[in-house]
Each structure stands twice: as C-alpha cells, then as structure tokens.
Amino acid sequence: MKAFFDTSVLVPAMVDQLRNHARCFPAFREYFGDGNEGFCSTHVLAECYSVMTALPLRRRIGPLDAQRLIRDTVTRRLTVISLGTDDYLEAIDRVSGNGLVSGIVYDALHLIAAERAACERIYTFNVDHFQRIGAGPIAITAP
C-alpha cells in the first residue's frame, strides 16, 4: 500500500505532546516497511518546520529540534516527492477552477504529489479539503 502523509498527520505523529499523537504515530509507523511505502512532498517538509516551531507547547520545539525531526524521522522513512513550477500552477488551476480560495491550494499540492507517487491513500485531518478538490480514486482518511 502506498500512502501520502499530510502535515496535519505528520506533525502529531512526531510530537507526543499533541492530542492526536496516539492516532497518528501508529499510522506513520505502519509505513516504515513490510511492503508499505510512505510519501510526502517537499512542501510538507516546510509546513512541518513552520508548524512545529510555532506550536504553543510546554516543551517547545526549537529550530534545530524541528530540523532533526524532519531530517531523521520524515526524510529517512518517507519518499519525498519534489514539486516544481508546473505542479504549483496545476494546484492553482485546480482550486481556482473549483472556486476554492486560500490555504486549500496547499492541499492541492499534496494531492498532486500523491497522484504522482500513485498513492492509494492520503492521511490527513483535512479530509473535506481533499474531497472538495477532487481526489478521484485516492482514499482520503484521518488516522
């Protein structure tokens, strides 16, 4: 099974102080091997850094800690799909064509990366965003 991981699932998978950690970490761990393949996009890496370093946690995640989590946890366990100019333009075309606005464009980028990797599933807590964009045959689920 090939699965794409959205930022909304990856961050709680890595940060045990977040309430969704118990749901997200097992889903993430399932893609460490045993015939399953996990994916994320280059844009997800930047989003993870942005979110982790801004979380209002008791034990804050500093810049170097976020960097290590991304390098040692995400990029060593998931295949990272690089996004280029054409991907960004396609994401904008998809959301604008559906009359969608604002940050949903980032989920369109994730969908494009998941399609390129031939993923069968996207793990996200933004299920409605992906459904509004039109995910086609890819299963969109929260962990």
Region spans (language model):
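Generic alpha-helical structural context detector
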Residues: P12, S50-T53, R71, D93
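A mid-sequence interfacial segment
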Residues: L83-C119
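Acidic, PIN/NYN-like endoribonuclease modules and their adjacent C-terminal/linker elements
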Residues: K2, L111-P143
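Alpha-helix/helix-capping structural signal
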Residues: S8-V9, H43, D86, L109, ...
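Short, well-structured N-terminal submotif of metal-dependent ribonuclease cores
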Residues: M1-C40, L55-R68, R132
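Short beta-strand scaffold positions
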Residues: F5, F39-C40, S82, V105, ...
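Short active-site oxyanion
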Residues: D34-G38, L78-T79, R116-R121
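Acidic catalytic patch
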Residues: D16, T42-A46, V74-N98
